[in-house]
Amino acid sequence: MIQQPTTAKPRISTSSKLNTVLSKNKENVPGKLFKKFKCPSLVISEKRKELPLRKKPRVNYSEYGSVDGKYDSAYVSENVSGLATIKEANRLILNHERRDPSTVIKKQFSVPKPIKGHEDISKLCAHRPPPTLGMKRKVDFIPRPLYDPADEFAIVLYDPTTDADEIIPDIKEVLAEKRKKDELLKNRKGKKEISDSEPESDHDSCVSTDTVASCSTEQSLITSNTSKHRRPNKSLKDLLGIQKEKPPPPPVAVVIDPKLARILRPHQIEGVKFLYKCVTGRIDRCANGCIMADEMGLGKTLQCIALLWTLLKQSPQAGKPTIEKAIITCPSSLVKNWANELVKWLGKDAITPFILDGKSSKQELIMALQQWASVHGRQVTRPVLIASYETLRSYVEHLNNAEIGMLLCDEGHRLKNSDSLTFTALDKLNVQRRVILSGTPIQNDLSEYFSLLNFANPGLLGSRQEFRKNYEIPILKGRDADGTEKDKENGDAKLAELAKIVNRFIIRRTNDILSKYLPVKYEHVVFCNLSEFQLSLYKHFITSPEINKILRGTGSQPLKAIGLLKKICNHPDLLNLTEDLEGCEALFPPGFIPRELRGRDRNIDSSLSGKMLVLERMLYQIKQETDDKIVLISNYTSTLDLFEQLCRARGYKALRLDGTMNVNKRQRLVDTFNDPEKDAFVFLLSSKAGGCGINLIGANRLILFDPDWNPAADQQALARVWRDGQKKDCFVYRFIATGTIEEKIFQRQSHKQSLSSCVVDEAQDVERHFSLDNLRQLFQLNDHTVCETHETYKCKRCRDGKQFIRAPAMLYGDTSTWNHFTNPTLDRIEDHLLKREAGKQQVSTVFQYKSH
C-alpha cells in the first residue's frame, strides 16, 4: 500500500485500524478472536520501586465467576515467592457463599493474633473481654457477690446454697398482693350488699370466675378469627432465635463488709443476722419490722449501722442494693452522735449523711428535703437522712411521696403513745422496713409495748382494744399479788401466747454479755435517811389540809404535791418555803435563812439534806484519793444548780449539760469531758436532756440523785459510763430517801421491771412482790424503818437486819436477788466510799449488784 502525500491528515476509521493490526500479526491470531480480558497494569514509578516489598502475599480473586476454571489456585507474587505457600494463600480466600443465619450468630468470635513485636499489648488487655463485633451476642457475666462468702472471716447473711427456700420477697409485690386482696374483699362486700340473696361463699367467687373465663374465651375467639386474615409475621427476635424474656440471674450471697466483720462481737453478729431476716421478710412476708431491745451498752448502734450499710450496698441480685435511701430518727441530742458513729465505723468517705441539725433556714430545708425525696438510683448522693423526732415530725409532709427503704428509730420508746403527733406523723411515711431501738420497750404498761409493736409491724396484734382484751388485762391480773391462782394460770397462758407471736420480731439480750468485754461494774441502791430539818418539813406537809384534800379525793393538784415532796427529799433549798409550805417558819433551825431571802449569798448547806451530805463526802474522797471522774444526774435542773454551787464552793471543775444547751454544742462538751488530758472532774447531767445515748466513758463513777417514775429513764441514765471503751471498774450509786415517796417510786419501778422481765426477758421466776393497792400509798411516811422495800421482799437470806447468805446469783432487774447491807454491816462491802459510811446516820441500807 502506497500512501499519497497530502497536506491534511486523513481520518482513519476504527475498522481499518483493526484490519491493519490483524494483517501485521496474522501469524499470531488464533482461530477464534476470544481471549480472557486482562486489565492493563499501571506503570510503576521510580518512587514505587523504592518502597519495601509487601510482607503479605497478594491474592488473586479472579477465579470467582471464571469459566474455564484455570485460576482455581491463588496468585502469589513472584517477589514474595517462598514466603507463603499455596495452602496458606488458599486460607486467606474470603468465602462469599450464603450461610445459615443461626450458624453465624452462634459462632464464637476469636480475637486476632497479636502483631509481632506487640505481644505486651495483648498481655495488658488480657483481663478485658473481647470486643463485640457484628452479630456477636452480648457477654453474660457470672453474677458474683460483693464480698467473698468463702473467706475465713466472712459473715454471710444470705447464702443461696442453704437459704434457697427462703426467697426474699419484693416489698412492692407484697404490697400489690395486699391491695388485690383488699379490692377483692371490697368487691365481695359490694356484691353481697347489692344481691342480698345468699350469704357470701365460694359460689360467688366461682360465678365471678366463670364470668371472667367466658369473657376471655369470647375475646380469644374474636382474636383468632381476625388473625386468620393476617399474615403470621414474626418479629426479628423470633427470626433470630433471641429469647424475649431472659431467665432471672441466680441469687448471690450477701456478706457483711469485712471492715465491720472484724469488729463485730458474737452477740452483735447474731443481732445483725436477726435484723436482716426481719427487714427482708424471711420471717414473715407481710412483716418487715422488728425491735432491737438489747439493754444499754451492747452495741445497738453498731449492729444497726452494719445492717444499714449492707442494705445500701448489697442484695441477692448481684450489683443491686436492697434499699436506696434510709432515715434515722433519734432524740435531738443524738443527731450529731449518729453522724459521728457512721464515720467511726464506716470510714470518713464511705457515706455522706444528710443531717438536719437546724443550721439551715426553713425554706432551704424544705427544698433540700424535696430534692432528697425525689432522687433515685445513681442520683442519690446522700442516702441516709438523720433527724430528730421533732424535726422529722415538722417536715414529714415533704417526705410523704418518697420511697424510703428503711426507717430506724433510736430510743424508740418515744413512740410509746400511738395517739401522739410523733407516732401519727412517722406512721404516714412510705416505708415498710421499720427498726425500733429501745433498751426498755416496756416502760409503764403493756399498752405502750403494743404501740411499739404496732408501729414496727402494723396489724400484727390486731387493734388496741383487741390487744387489751386478749393479752393486757389477763397478764396484769396474773401479775397482781392479790390475784387468784386461776388468774395466774390464765395470765401465764396469755403471756406464753403473746411471747410466741412477738419473739419472732424482737431480740433482747441483757448486760450480762458485757461481762466478757468490760471491767467489773458495782451498782448500789443507797437508802439515805432524811435530816432532822427535812423530816420536820416532810411531816408538816403530809399533814397539811392540802394533802388531806388529795387523800379524800377532793384535791385538784396531786402532781404538784408529789413534786414538792420529791424536792424536800433532795434539799430544802429547792423550795420557796414561805410560799410552798405555809406555817413552816417555826421549823427552821437556828440561823437558817430561806433561799428567797439570802440575796447573793447562795452557798449551799449540805447538812440540811441527808443525800447531799453523803454526796459531799463522796466527792471529797474521790478527788483526794483517786484520779476518777464522776457524773451527777438529776431529774431537776434546780438540783443541778445546787450541784454547781457545791462544786464551785469546793473548787471542783464541772461541766453541765441540760435542756437549755444547743444541740450542736452537746457533743463537743461530751468530747471535752471524755478527754483524759482535760481536768474536768464532775459532769452535771439532766436525765431529761441527755440521759439517752450519750457516752461518758471518761468517768467511771456515777450518782443518780433522785428516781424517776419511769424506770426506763433511770436505766438509761445509769448506763452512761459502763459502755464500750471503758477501761476502769465502774461504781454506780442510786440515792433513795428512806421511807419517803422516793422509796414508793422505787417500789413501783421494781413492779414495772418485773413486768418487763416477764414479757420481754421471759423470766418465769420473778416473784409478785407488790400489790397495786399498796403502791397507792404515796403520801405516807415511814420514819421507823431502815428500808421499807427490803421488808416487802420477805428476804430469806437476811435475819435481824443482817445478811447471812450472800446472793448466789444476782439478776440485774430484780433487786431482791442482790446483796443487802444495813448500816452496821457496811464494813463488809467492797466499795470503800460506802464502807466509810458505816456508823454514820445518813446511810441506812445498801443493795449491791456486781456484774461479774
Curated annotation (Swiss-Prot):
Residues 187-208 are annotated as: Disordered. One of its GO terms (cellular component) is nucleus. Its EC number is 3.6.4.12. Keywords: ATP-binding, DNA damage, DNA repair, DNA-binding, Helicase, Hydrolase, Metal-binding, Nucleotide-binding, Nucleus, Phosphoprotein, Zinc. Residues 614-767 form the Helicase C-terminal domain. Gene3D superfamilies: P-loop containing nucleotide triphosphate hydrolases, SWI2/SNF2 ATPases, N-terminal domain, Tandem AAA-ATPase domain. A motif (DEGH box) lies at residues 410-413. A motif (Nuclear localization signal) lies at residues 35-51, 178-181. InterPro entries: Helicase_ATP-bd (IPR014001), Helicase_C-like (IPR001650), P-loop_NTPase (IPR027417), Rad54_N (IPR013967), SNF2-like_sf (IPR038718), SNF2/RAD54-like_C (IPR049730), SNF2_N (IPR000330), SNF2_RAD54_helicase_repair (IPR050496). The keyword Cell wall biogenesis/degradation does not apply. GO terms for biological process: DNA recombination; double-strand break repair via synthesis-dependent strand annealing; gene conversion at mating-type locus; meiotic gene conversion; reciprocal meiotic recombination. ATP binds at D294, E295, M296, G297, L298, G299, K300, T301. Pfam families: Helicase_C, Rad54_N, SNF2-rel_dom. It is found in: Nucleus. GO terms for molecular function: ATP binding; ATP hydrolysis activity; DNA binding; DNA translocase activity; helicase activity; metal ion binding. It comes from the Eukaryota. SMART domains: DEXDc, HELICc. Residues 281-459 form the Helicase ATP-binding domain. It is an enzyme of class 3 (hydrolase). CDD domains: DEXHc_RAD54A, SF2_C_SNF. It catalyses: ATP + H2O = ADP + phosphate + H(+). Homohexamer. Interacts with rhp51. Belongs to the SNF2/RAD54 helicase family. Plays an essential role in homologous recombination (HR) which is a major pathway for repairing DNA double-strand breaks (DSBs), single-stranded DNA (ssDNA) gaps, and stalled or collapsed replication forks. Acts as a molecular motor during the homology search and guides RAD51 ssDNA along a donor dsDNA thereby changing the homology search from the diffusion-based mechanism to a motor-guided mechanism. Plays also an essential role in RAD51-mediated synaptic complex formation which consists of three strands encased in a protein filament formed once homology is recognized. This is DNA repair protein rhp54. It comes from Schizosaccharomyces pombe (strain 972 / ATCC 24843). The lineage of its organism: Eukaryota, Fungi, Dikarya, Ascomycota, Taphrinomycotina.
